[in-house]
Amino acid sequence: MKSFTDLQEGLYDPNIFKAFFLAGGPGSGKSYVVKKSTGGTGLKIVNSDDVFEKYLKQAKLDFKMDANQGKQRDVLRTKAKKVTAKRKDNYLEGRLGLVIDGTGKDFNKISSQAAGLRQLGYDTHMIFVNTTLEVALQRNKERDRTVPEKIAIDSWKQVQSNVGKLQSLFGPKNFIIVDNDMPDTDGKLFDHVFKKVQGLLRKKVDNFIAKAWMAKELRLKQR
């Protein structure tokens, strides 16, 4: 039987009750940023795009959004979202640490999601990946799965218009901006971001809801 200390260390793992929202438009380099800034932390990534792209490859469909394949893609996208939602529910059941990938263009959706997580006892944070429009459009062209330029431009503008509101929602201390225009050749940028993420992960969750859940789990494990 595990000791009280062993049980307590598991429940007080720094990644439990931590949620990082990821924001940035198409071509911002979010996937690369999240890999560099949260890799090795054990945070669970919630991203339906990864699942969707896997399904596209399996079905041998074009990543360039061929209009003739629209119906097939829609079916796979719906399936990917359902699978991702199920995974997220499983993560939430164990109150595991999360990275919720998104663009940041729908402020109300993010606000609602953050509120729901806080009601479960989560500390919520945001990593905002920022680029100029020119860089975003160029990177979008270079991606395997591109989006039409007009959609990329509209998305970039919507995301930029939400920066202030998002910073207010999460608070300055929980809002990390990554200026990702230039290649991080010396590694200093991502080292700085990684340290910020680590600092937030090390901070113990100190709200009543999380403490009550952990106390309950501890009692169950001691039976």
Language-model features: where?
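Phosphate-binding P-loop
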Residues: G10-F17, N90-E93
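Proteolytic processing junctions in secreted/extracellular precursors
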Residues: K2-G10
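Conserved phosphate-donor/acceptor-positioning beta-strand/loop module used by diverse small-molecule
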Residues: K105, R118-R139
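Short hydrophobic/aromatic beta-strand immediately N-terminal to the Walker A/P-loop
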Residues: A19-F21
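Conserved substrate/cofactor phosphate-moiety recognition/catalytic segment
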Residues: S31-L96, N108
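Acidic, metal-coordinating catalytic cores used for nucleic-acid/nucleotide bond scission
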Residues: D101-I110
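The conserved Walker
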Residues: G25-P26
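Conserved GTP-binding G-domain of TRAFAC-class P-loop NTPases and closely related GTPase folds
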Residues: L133-R223
